């Protein structure tokens, strides 16, 4: 009956609008950490809808203190059971270092060794130029040479963090801006194809 369909749609819209008040988790119980780069089309790559996941973006898709804050809230209080970390190719965070950025701001007269990093927590201050360079978390400063390395490092940090429940599934992927597809870290499709062509069987 039409009335049943209308009633169902009304309830669906109500649940969507009031899901936090009703304690309803996102549809896939999923939290995604990825880069703010507009070329990373997360929903398309994963085949999900906006209501399926909480998506957290920052420069580089890096695990930061605020990323951990958000991840801990969604997994402990919003019913999230899975975390997916997505970095991407051609990321600007691999092109620079914290030292280069520190010099840029120092040349502008900014005292990078005296910065208050959280307006609500005045005691949290960067007390040296070295602190400032580490705070930006450029890939090379983290000992990573590729988005693949960062994806794996991010996943490992989250898996071992005391604020993230141990029963949460955590996975890492790399989004290729050239193909708009996801792949596992260090497993480029053309490399796998080349191994098969040369008679090498790939085992996971």
From Swiss-Prot:
Reactions the enzyme catalyzes: carbon disulfide + 2 H2O = 2 hydrogen sulfide + CO2 + 2 H(+)
Enzyme class (EC, first level): hydrolase
Top-level taxon: Archaea
EC number(s) given by UniProt: 3.13.1.5
Pathway: Sulfur metabolism; hydrogen sulfide biosynthesis
Cofactor: how and how many bound: Binds 1 zinc ion per subunit.
Residues that hold Zn(2+) according to the record: 35, 88, 91
GO BP annotations, alphabetical order: hydrogen sulfide biosynthetic process
Cofactor(s) for this UniProt protein: Zn(2+)
Cystine crosslinks: none
Any one GO MF annotation of this record: hydrolase activity
Pfam families cross-referenced by the UniProt entry: Pro_CA
Keyword Zinc: yes
Keywords: Hydrolase, Metal-binding, Zinc
InterPro entries, per database record: Carbonic_anhydrase (IPR001765), Carbonic_anhydrase_sf (IPR036874)
Function: Catalyzes the conversion of carbon disulfide into hydrogen sulfide and carbon dioxide, with carbonyl sulfide as an intermediate. Likely plays a key role in sulfur metabolism in S.solfataricus. Does not show carbonic anhydrase activity (hydration of CO(2) to carbonate).
Complex formation: Forms a hexadecameric catenane homooligomer, through interactions of two interlocked octameric rings.
Family indicated by similarity: Belongs to the beta-class carbonic anhydrase family.
Listed name of the protein: Carbon disulfide hydrolase
Organism: Saccharolobus solfataricus (strain ATCC 35092 / DSM 1617 / JCM 11322 / P2) (Sulfolobus solfataricus)
Higher taxonomy: Archaea, Thermoproteota, Thermoprotei, Sulfolobales, Sulfolobaceae
């Amino acid at each position: 009956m039409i009335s049943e369909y209308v009633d169902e749609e009304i309830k669906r819209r109500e649940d969507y609008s009031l899901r936090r008040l009703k304690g309803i988790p996102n549809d896939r119980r999923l939290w995604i950490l990825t880069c703010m780069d507009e070329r990373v089309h997360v929903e398309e790559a994963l085949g999900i809808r906006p209501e399926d996941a909480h998506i957290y973006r920052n420069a580089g898709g890096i695990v930061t203190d605020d990323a951990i804050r958000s991840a801990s809230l969604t997994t402990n209080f919003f019913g999230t059971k899975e975390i997916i970390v997505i970095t991407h190719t051609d990321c600007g965070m691999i092109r620079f270092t914290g030292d280069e950025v520190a010099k840029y701001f120092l040349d502008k007269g900014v005292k990078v060794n005296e910065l208050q990093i959280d307006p609500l927590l005045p005691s949290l201050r960067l007390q040296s130029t070295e602190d400032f360079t580490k705070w930006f978390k450029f890939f090379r400063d983290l000992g990573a040479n590729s988005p693949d390395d960062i994806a794996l490092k991010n996943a490992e940090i989250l898996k071992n963090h005391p604020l993230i429940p141990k029963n949460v599934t955590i996975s890492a992927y790399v989004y290729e801006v050239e193909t708009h597809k996801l792949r596992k870290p260090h497993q480029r499709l053309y490399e796998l194809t080349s191994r098969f062509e040369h008679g090498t069987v790939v085992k996971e």
